[in-house]
Amino acid sequence: MLTEKFDNLVKQLRVLPGVGQKTAQRMALHLLNGRRGQGSALAQALDIAMHEIIECRQCHSFSDDDICPICVDPRRDDSVLCVVETAADVMAIEQAAGYRGRYFVLGGHLSPLDGINADDLNIDQLVNRVKTAPVDEIILATSTTVEGQTTAHFIAEAVRRHVGKVTRIAQGIPMGGELEYLDSMTLSQALQNRS
């Protein structure tokens, strides 16, 4: 629109969720209109994040090191493992401030229509995890979408013989809802009232 470089900046900003053409243009103009220091700081933070944030080799969430701060925290309850779809779900549960166990991030959910099957997720690693480091309970905290429900059922069957108890977070979360978009109170209650 203005220049080729400006158009490229707008195009790159549009890859962010919820950012359309107009919002991307406003963001670009905001950064270029006397806030170039903020733009440079943003670019540097993005560069560092893209190169230095890695996947925790234990839970598969994001980490600055091989093992994330949650996995190395000795105050966490090793007997309970909460299985979620994404690192965003870990953040949502942590912000609800009611869960003190460990996590395991699947890396998505089963979706045959999109060509995503069990081999594309961290399900084998989850089964190996509960075989080598047994837990008393697995909490299945996948989304309440059809794909999330299917994933929860598949995991329950895969781990049932290796775990004392497999539970699902309580219903009451809106059908079709994504965990990362729930308010903290709803998510906290769902974890406390799991069945």
UniProtKB/Swiss-Prot annotation:
Domain of life per record: Bacteria
Domain Toprim: 79-174
SMART domains named among the record's database cross-references: TOPRIM
One GO biological process term: DNA repair
Keyword line: DNA damage, DNA recombination, DNA repair, Metal-binding, Zinc, Zinc-finger
Family statement: Belongs to the RecR family.
Known function: May play a role in DNA repair. It seems to be involved in an RecBC-independent recombinational process of DNA repair. It may act with RecF and RecO.
PANTHER family given in the database record: RECOMBINATION PROTEIN RECR
Protein name (record): Recombination protein RecR
Top-level taxonomy: Bacteria, Pseudomonadati, Pseudomonadota, Gammaproteobacteria, Moraxellales
